[in-house]
Amino acid sequence: GIGVKEGAEYRFSVWARGENQKLRIELIRNDTMEERQAFESKELTVNSKDWKQYEVILKSPRTEPKAHLRIFLESAGTVDLEHVSLFPVDTWKERKNGLRKDLVQALYDIKPGVFRFPGGCIVEGTDEATRYEWKKTVGAVENRPLNENRWHYTFKHRFFPDYFQTYGLGFFEYFQLSEDIGAEPLPILNCGLVCQYQNDPDQQVSLSKLDSYIQDALDLIEFANGDVTTTWGKVRADMGHPAPFNLKFLGIGNEQWGPEYPERLKQFVEVLRKAHPEIKIVGSSGPQSEGKDFDYLWPEMKNLKVDLVDEHFYRPES
C-alpha cells in the first residue's frame, strides 16, 4: 500500500495521450467492503493525441497506512498512460521529485563530511548490462530507464518479487543533496568490473574496451563542474543548477579485488591525472579490512599513487 497522511497533499502526474478521455484518479482502501472505497478523488481530461503531461493534486482527508491508487477511464475509448506517479507535495525544499523532509533533516543534523553514492554492488551490477550508469540517471525523470537492482537475486525475504530501481533519484539529485547537507560528494563509478562474486574474470570488460568507462568518468566531472557551454555542464544547467557542484573527489571501483582491479584502475588514473589533476582519485582496498586481498591491494594503490583508499569494515560492534 501507499501511506498517506491526513491533510497532506499528493501530486498525481501522468504522461498520456487520447482524445477527450476523462480519467478519475482515486485514493482508495481496498480492504473495506464499503460501497465507496475511495476517500479522495479528482478528475482530469486527456485532450491530446500527442504525449502530454497531466497533473492533479489529491488531498487526503485521513491517514491511511495502506492506501491504493486507482485510475478509472470514465467513458468508452482508448487512452495511453505512461510514467504514472503519486508524489508528496511537501518535500525537502518543496522540490518536485524531491526527497522526504525528515530523512534529509536527519542527514543534515549529523553533519556528514563526505557523502558516497551510489556505493556498494549497485555500482557493479549483476552483469555489464545492469551496472549503474550515471548518464541514465540525469535529465527528465520520465526519460530515465528502469534498471534491475543488483540485489534482485540475493534477498529471498523481500516483500515484492521484483527488485528494481527507477533512477528517480539520480546524480543530479545526489549532487544537489550533498550541497544541501554540506557534504563533499564522493561518486563511485564502475571501473569495468561487474560483481566479482557472481562473475569469473573472463566475463569482465577487457582492458582494451575501457575507453567508454573512462569517458564516463571525464563526463561526470564535466557534468558536476563544467561550464554551462560544455555538453554536460549544459545538462546540469538545464536541470536547474547552472553553478558548478565543485566536485573534488572521484571513486573508481567499489569493493574490487585481485589483479583485475589495479590493472583497470591504472588506465583511469593515467587519463584523469592529465585531464583533471585537481580531482582526487579514490581507490579501494577491497571488501575486507584485513587478509590476502587487503594486503595485496594496499601496495597496488600506493604504486598507482591514488590520493585516498576506501577501506570497508564489516565487523560487529565488539
Tell what function each PLM region has.
Residues 25, 60, 67-78, 236, ...:
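Noncatalytic carbohydrate-binding groove/subsite architecture in carbohydrate-active enzymes
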